[in-house]
Amino acid sequence: MRITFTWTYLFLLVSIALSAQNNNMTTFHIASYNLRMDTPSDSLDSWEHRKAKVNSLIRFHDFDIFGTQEGFHHQIMDIIKPGDYAYTGVGRDDGKDAGEHSAIIYKKDRFLVLDKGDFWFSETPEIPGKGWDATCCNRICSWAKFKDITSGKEFYFFNVHYDHQGREAQRQSSLLLMKKI
């Protein structure tokens, strides 16, 4: 699984590097952030107790763009509420708001979304569902093609959250991801 994530991030970095024009390098602060879903059983670690710290951390590190995992719609809304960020991505359960998101959150004054989409890691990637030997739940990839407003450079960002146990699901998800890229 680590190899898959390495290839995914390598592809992102190569995409950014290849989009450089006239050897003018543009830098972005990018990250991946597993928000941890909001569940009442978390008690004092519930989202209500964590959201201010999460927001502080995001703004402290001044991420330009980052992918999230396990965030419910209301958690994503809490992050973008101050107005400096926007997001793309859908809930994994219905393709709208239900279920966890693998959202891409970005500074809305720095990037334009030129194209975007979502697909599920299953035998039917356009329909919400889980595939192969996935043990838990639907898994999704959210992606977007961005344009950096300051440099004019374009790049793609793919954000994933694989099944944590199904080895065949992980392998097939990687193959599907590479096909989509």
Identify the residue ranges that each predicted region occupies:
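Bacterial Sec-dependent N-terminal signal peptides
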Residues: 1-26
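Active-site-flanking beta-strand signature of metal-NTP-handling nucleotidyl enzymes
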Residues: 14, 31, 158
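N-terminal, active-site-proximal structural segment of metallo-dependent hydrolase catalytic domains
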Residues: 18-83, 93-100, 174-175
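Short strand-loop junctions, especially beta-strand C-caps/beta-turns
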Residues: 36-40, 160-165
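Short, solvent-exposed loop/turn segments at secondary-structure boundaries
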Residues: 42-46, 131-132, 167-171
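Generic structural signal for well-ordered alpha-helical scaffold segments
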Residues: 55, 145, 178-181
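Structured beta-strand-rich core segments of catalytic domains in phosphoester-bond hydrolases
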Residues: 65-158, 162
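A long, amphipathic alpha-helix that forms part
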Residues: 167-181
